[in-house]
Amino acid sequence: MAPAEVRTGTGPGRIVVAVYAVLALAATGRSILQVTSYFERAPLAYVLSAVAAVIYIVATAALAKGGAVGARVATGAILIEAVGVLTVGTLSFVQPDLFPDKTVWSHFGAGYGYLPLVLPFVGLWWLHRATRGRATTADDRPPGVSSPGGPDGA
């Protein structure tokens, strides 16, 4: 399969994209309200809610776009999402004073049915499934690296 043929937003991937889109909308709405109305209550928590919203938007767009570039961007965004939800989730339990108000990722996304905790792993699984078995083409290899069998591919 050529790089442009990586399809992350088709088949069951449509569900993954839809869930990311819903979470992107929810996180964006929540963070806008928190930052514009209550910022002084919990600035760190609210900024992290806004960061989560941006990450969900990037992941949604990249998953929907597909292709080799879309898959790489989605993988990066989802890895950041996973680290973020695990870090913020842990900190919200061990240092609750840092998170005096609820955010998307606090308590591992308890306010969202723990979807923020599960979603990055579902997203990474889907990306792996969508890109596995894809033939490596010259476009995927670093400069100067020929095919495994040599210049003629034999």
Locate each region found by the language model.
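Transmembrane alpha-helix entry/boundary detector in multi-pass membrane proteins
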Residues: P12-V16, S31-A52
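C-terminal TM-helix exit segments that contain a strictly Trp-centered aromatic cap at the helix terminus
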Residues: A27-Q34, I80-P96
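Individual transmembrane alpha-helices with interfacial aromatic-anchor signatures
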Residues: K102-V122
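Cytosolic juxtamembrane helix and N-cap/initiation of the first transmembrane helix
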Residues: M1-L23, G153-A154
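Membrane-interface helix termini and inter-helical loops of multi-pass transporters
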Residues: L33-Y38, Q95-W105
